[in-house]
Design a protein with these regions (language model features):
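His/Asp/Glu-enriched short active-site or ligand-binding loop at hydrolase and phosphoryl-transfer sites
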Residues: 77, 202-225, 245, 272-273
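Short secondary-structure boundary segments
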Residues: 57, 115-116, 191, 221, ...
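N-terminal signal peptide c-region/cleavage motif recognized by signal peptidases
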Residues: 27-31
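Extracytoplasmic substrate-binding proteins
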Residues: 33-36, 42-43, 109-110, 114, ...
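Short helices/loops that flank or line small-molecule/ion binding pockets
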Residues: 100-107, 129, 228-237
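Bacterial N-terminal signal peptides that target proteins for export
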Residues: 10-19
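A short, structured surface patch at a secondary-structure boundary
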Residues: 51-106, 110-116, 217
Length: 306
């Protein structure tokens, strides 16, 4: 019939135009950069989700595995030992001193560093060598969940990472609810003996202490891991002393405090120990450490004079 053919041709042209535009859009999307801001505000660009990742701290390696990105890791630093698969990764030095040549040789498309643990001068050198560097700095318990989500985005494993982040937040909320109304316990958290070191206010462990209804007696200090004196501890007079050492074994030096009989923590035998791996690594396992910390502070409360 007259007029039908032009309409059909017009329809076909529209279909072809739509198909061409769609193909162009998809092609552009496929080559679009992924843009992120790291914890220092630095812009990080990736052409596609990272496939060759180097973690410059044990907790970063552990969190990458938790985020489903373990198979995308090509290197890490000394003491990266969890999960067991992390022990098999090539080493690129220690987190405080990395081997730039070893990193470059592994041809990573992403290096994830720790602001307060790694040397930021070396991080800048990695950027100068043309490598993409993402700086991480979790300071609060909630940051662990956010970190999992971000690692999932960086590695293209959000399906796993988002589930782990949700589980973390659920456990965190349960701990918060269980400890919200408990009386405060003045707490000294001892990282090491010589030099005598603790955690300052910005440190994630201070957040864990608050979560458990504790009050970090050195929480007013702005450093992450300040050195302090025995006299400062005596003056602060904590009700509980929580120490870490190496692994599960209670450090022998914890009972060095017994000589200071005036300390409330000593008088009530509130000298506790937690494995540093589950307390001082910014990973999902920090909730295991926090659970133990909360239990220790409950013991301290139970030993108060009636």
């Amino acid at each position: 019939m007259p007029g039908k053919r032009p309409r059909r041709m017009e329809t076909r042209m529209k279909i072809r135009l739509f198909a061409a535009l769609t193909a162009t859009f998809l092609a552009a999307s496929a080559h679009a950069e992924l843009l992120f801001k790291d914890d220092t505000g630095h812009e990080v660009r990736l052409r596609e989700p990272a496939r060759r990742i180097i973690a410059l701290a044990p907790h970063i390696a552990e969190s990458l595995y938790a985020a489903g990105a373990g198979s995308r890791m090509v290197g890490t630093v000394d003491y990266s030992d969890y999960p067991p698969a992390a022990k098999q990764l090539p080493r690129v030095g220690g987190y405080s001193r990395i081997d730039l040549e070893a990193i470059v040789a592994l041809k990573p498309d992403l290096v994830i560093a720790w602001e307060s643990g790694n040397n930021m001068v070396q991080a800048d050198k990695l950027r100068a060598l043309g490598l993409t560097v993402y700086i991480s700095q979790p300071n609060r318990m909630e940051d662990v969940a956010s970190q999992l989500e971000r690692y999932g985005q960086l590695a293209g494993t959000s399906a796993v990472a988002d589930v782990e982040a949700r589980r973390f937040r659920e456990r965190l909320a349960a701990l918060q609810a269980a400890n919200a109304s408990k009386p405060k316990v003045r707490t000294f958290y001892q990282i090491w003996k010589a030099p005598l070191m603790t955690v300052g206010g910005p440190q994630i462990i201070s957040d864990a202490i608050r979560l458990c209804g504790g009050d970090n007696v050195f929480g007013h200090l702005k450093q992450m891991a300040p050195r302090i004196s025995v006299e400062a501890v005596i003056e602060a007079n904590p009700e509980a002393i929580v120490a870490t050492g190496m692994g599960d074994a209670k450090p022998e030096w914890l009972h060095d405090w017994d000589k200071w009989k005036s300390l409330t923590a000593v008088k009530r035998d509130n000298l506790f120990h937690i494995n540093p791996d589950i307390m001082q690594r910014h990973t999902p396992r920090i909730l295991d450490g926090a659970t133990k910390l909360c239990a220790h502070l409950d013991v301290a409360r139970s030993r108060r004079p009636k």
